[in-house]
Swiss-Prot record:
Recorded family membership: Belongs to the NAD-dependent DNA ligase family. LigA subfamily.
Molecular function as annotated in GO: DNA binding; DNA ligase (NAD+) activity; metal ion binding
Chain sites annotated for binding NAD(+): 57-61, 106-107, 135, 158, 197, 313, 337
Catalysis: reaction(s): NAD(+) + (deoxyribonucleotide)n-3'-hydroxyl + 5'-phospho-(deoxyribonucleotide)m = (deoxyribonucleotide)n+m + AMP + beta-nicotinamide D-nucleotide
Cofactor dependence: Mg(2+); Mn(2+)
Protein species of origin: Thermobifida fusca (strain YX)
HAMAP family (alphabetical): DNA_ligase_A
Location of region: Disordered: 1-27, 216-235
Annotated positions binding Zn(2+): 431, 434, 450, 456
Keyword set, alphabetical order: DNA damage, DNA repair, DNA replication, Ligase, Magnesium, Manganese, Metal-binding, NAD, Zinc
Entry-linked SUPFAM superfamilies: BRCT domain, DNA ligase/mRNA capping enzyme, catalytic domain, Nucleic acid-binding proteins, RuvA domain 2-like
The protein's name: DNA ligase
Function: DNA ligase that catalyzes the formation of phosphodiester linkages between 5'-phosphoryl and 3'-hydroxyl groups in double-stranded DNA using NAD as a coenzyme and as the energy source for the reaction. It is essential for DNA replication and repair of damaged DNA.
Enzyme Commission number(s) of this protein: 6.5.1.2
Length: 745
């Protein structure tokens, strides 16, 4: 959610620019730029408030920063009407206006560690701070609830900070908002004004958009817009049909209760039955604040709601009063903003690429833009139906999203910015790599596929790159350029590999003559050499003297290591459709050898936990193809492992045991811990349930730890994990953490 907003007056969807004091020391071009920025920011904020923004939060923040810089350089430009001095949003005439009991302020932002440190030093220089409260900054809609003698009497949007809109009827439809406070532990105060954030959980947002698409209605761009649109419905029944939720994060006006610390207020709010986040932490140093920020930067998608940063507050309320506020924000709090995950940019073109299983996928060619900390030029569009559903046209300004390590995707168009020159995308009818006619694998498929699985060089390149990946045989030296060199070299005319079966039979003599294009792994398009402006060509395996580069020795060493990988990794490396790591692990644990899997019937495959009819049919179909079986035999002849370790040794120590691993372990990487369990016959899953036997916790465990405590699942620290691996489940249960022990203490 933005921490800034437009003014309270609006005429014809556009606010008049502020009338700054015209002094001789302000150049005319600066005054003009200030007026333009002020007008634009007010307009952008109004559209944001309505749930239909036309620029991203990141772009808004950049413009606001520019305006602040101008006003810092020329203080005479600062007026009460400047966007830098205002809070919230304008009041529409669709809801009754209501005055807040206490002004709902915004927050100042920190976009870097240096800005966070500067804030902390300013605060500590004025008051003796001994504790900070850290909480997640929910990307939702700010509201205020008013309770009188424990009964909800009013709810309002933030509005301009002084006057909001009465949304009481709509708020009453949200299940998590109590209509009466719970007084079983503490009596309800005479008056209580509660501040919080209304949001739409991510899964609920996806379901809502799917339903809207089925009804032929335009989808929402993101959960924040969906929450705003849902909460501002004239008909409360529409709001009730949307699974909105709320978390409260502060108290405004109050009578009949004494608040000494921010953290104490949260304890009271929770006791009264109000929804409070379970991810709040009170810390004593700035370094601990940094640790909290860093943890949720990495685990940004653990919560059920979207976040865009961390709010840091001075915990002591008496110190908050001493620090006071500016006209728009408290001095005792700051919002540390994470790099934006959504930005707007130009959709230059839509092209297609072929994947390892033959699926031909449209992708967006974008005007380069920075999102989530990295520059993005391409984004996935999944399939032709998805392009149509999103309503994007070539030439559109589009919203692009990149969440963590997830591949960037185009969310949708900014329709208001269309010029009439945009054009629709037409899905090609031929493979972009080999020219084979595209078709559906079965009736009703949304994907078009290239059927030329054996001879399409594009598919082979993608399969080879996949084999080298961490989820398969983990051959670091066999990257995307090497995969291209081995399957589609410019020289020699005949590639060293005709299929992946030959991978373990490569020789140095085959590699040295190779010259190849350098392709982009996201698009398979040639990369351009900035010096020549032409496609980049390299001699990948040989130096200028024609001698092997170090990469050659490394490649052959890693190929030998790959032969010893666990059976499940070999199964994944075969690129059988629908068989990912989880299914492969289940199959390897059950059948113990690749031959047994190849010979199993559909019924026998479906009998394995986690294997359904789609996966079973896909496996049977794959092994029925002659050249697929030839790949297996070539690998077997080269010495690739085809059985589970100890396949003939009978039952193993952790047979039937399901484990979840969370947090950072000292002796094991996440994959290493997982494989240690699997070698002993155990299963590692990604979620905690009543069927989970153990949860292993390291440093900074996430919500899985909390769920394990709630469900009573045995929790092991790293020492207990060693007991599990060496002595088995019975001994591990005896080594579990007791209820009064905590990995978080």
């Amino acid at each position: 959610m933005r921490n800034h907003g437009p003014g309270s007056e609006r005429k014809d969807a556009c606010v008049s620019a502020p009338d700054p004091t015209f002094s001789d020391d302000v150049p005319a071009d600066v005054r003009e730029r200030h007026a333009r920025l002020s007008q634009d920011l007010d307009d952008y904020s109004y559209r944001y408030y309505l749930g239909s923004p036309i620029i991203s939060d990141a772009e808004y923040d950049q413009l606001m920063a520019e305006l602040r810089d101008l006003e810092a350089q020329y203080p005479s430009l600062v007026t009460p009407d400047s966007p830098t001095q205002k809070v919230g949003a304008p009041i529409s005439n669709e809801f009754a206006p209501v005055e807040h009991l206490e002004r709902m302020q915004s927050l100042d932002n920190a976009f870097s560690d240096a800005q966070l440190e500067a804030w902390a030093h300013r605060v500590s220089a004025e008051v003796p701070v001994d504790a900070f409260l850290c909480e997640l900054k929910i990307d939702g809609l700010a509201v205020a609830l008013v309770y009188e003698k424990g009964r909800l009497v009013r709810a309002a949007t933030r509005g301009d900070g002084r006057i909001g809109e009465d949304i009481t009827l709509n708020i009453r439809t949200i299940d998590t908002v109590p209509l009466r406070l719970d007084e079983s532990r503490y009596p309800a105060p005479e008056l209580l004004e509660v501040r919080g954030e209304v949001f739409l959980p991510v899964k609920a947002f996806e379901q809502l958009n799917s339903r809207l698409a089925d009804e032929g209605k335009p989808p929402f761009a993101n959960p924040r817009n969906a929450a705003a649109g849902s909460l501002r419905q004239k008909d409360p029944r529409v709001t009730a049909s949307r699974p909105l939720s709320m978390l409260v994060h502060g108290i405004g006006a109050h009578r009949g209760v004494t608040i000494t610390h921010q953290s104490q207020s949260y304890e009271l709010l929770a006791a009264w039955g109000l929804p409070v986040s379970d991810r709040i932490r009170v810390v004593s140093t700035l370094d601990e604040v940094r640790e909290y920020i860093a943890y949720y930067a990495e685990h940004r998608h653990d919560p059920e709601y979207e976040i865009d940063g961390v709010v840091v507050k001075v915990d002591d309320v008496s110190l908050q009063r001493r620090l006071g506020s500016t006209s728009r924000a408290p001095r005792w709090a700051i919002a540390y903003k994470y790099p934006p995950e959504e930005v707007t940019t130009k959709l230059l073109d839509i092209k297609t690429s072929v994947g390892r299983t033959g699926r031909v996928t449209p992708y967006a060619v974008l005007e380069p833009v920075k999102v989530a900390g990295s520059e993005v030029e391409f984004a996935t569009l999944h399939n032709a139906q998805e392009v149509a559903r999103k309503g994007v046209l070539i030439g559109d300004t589009v919203v692009v999203r990149k969440a963590g390590d997830i591949i960037p995707e185009v969310v949708g168009p900014v329709v208001e910015k269309r010029t009439g020159t945009e054009r629709p995308f037409v899905m090609p009818t031929e493979c972009p790599e080999c020219g084979s006619p595209l078709g559906q694998q079965k009736e009703g498929d949304v994907d078009l596929r290239c059927p030329n699985t054996r001879y399409c060089k594009g598919q082979l390149r993608e399969r080879l790159a996949f084999i080298a990946g961490r989820k398969a045989l983990d051959i670091e030296a066999l990257g995307y350029v090497a995969a291209t060199a081995l399957t589609q070299p410019l020289e020699p005319a005949e590639p060293p590999l005709r299929d992946e079966g030959d991978l373990f039979s490569l020789t140095v003599e085959q590699l040295l003559p190779i010259r190849t294009l350098v392709l982009d792994p996201d698009t398979a398009e040639p990369k351009i050499d900035p010096k020549t402006g032409k496609p980049k060509v390299v001699s990948f395996f040989a130096n200028q003297k024609g001698e092997p580069k170090k990469i050659v020795e490394k490649l052959f060493q890693q190929l030998e290591e790959a032969k010893k990988r666990p059976l499940w990794r070999v199964l994944v490396a075969l690129s059988i459709r629908h068989v990912g790591p989880r299914a492969a692990e289940d199959l390897a644990r059950h059948f113990r050898s690749l031959d047994a899997i190849a010979q199993a019937s559909e019924e026998e495959l479906e009998a394995v936990e986690g294997i359904g009819p789609t996966i079973a049919r896909s496996i049977v179909d794959w092994f029925s193809v002659d050249w697929h079986r030839e790949i297996v035999e070539k690998w077997r002849a080269a010495g690739v492992r085809m059985e589970e370790e100890g396949a003939d040794d009978g039952p193993r120590l952790l047979d039937g045991i399901t484990t979840v691993i969370t947090g950072t372990l000292e002796k094991y990487s996440r994959d290493g811990a997982k494989e240690a369990v699997q070698k002993l016959g155990g299963r590692v899953t990604g979620s905690v349930s009543r069927k989970t036997d153990f949860v292993v916790v390291g440093a900074n465990p996430g919500s899985k730890y909390d769920k394990a405590v709630k469900l009573g699942v045995p929790i092991l620290d790293e020492a207990g994990f060693e007991v599990l691996l060496t002595q088995g489940p019975e001994a591990a249960r005896a080594a579990r953490l007791s209820e009064d022990e905590s990995v978080l203490s």
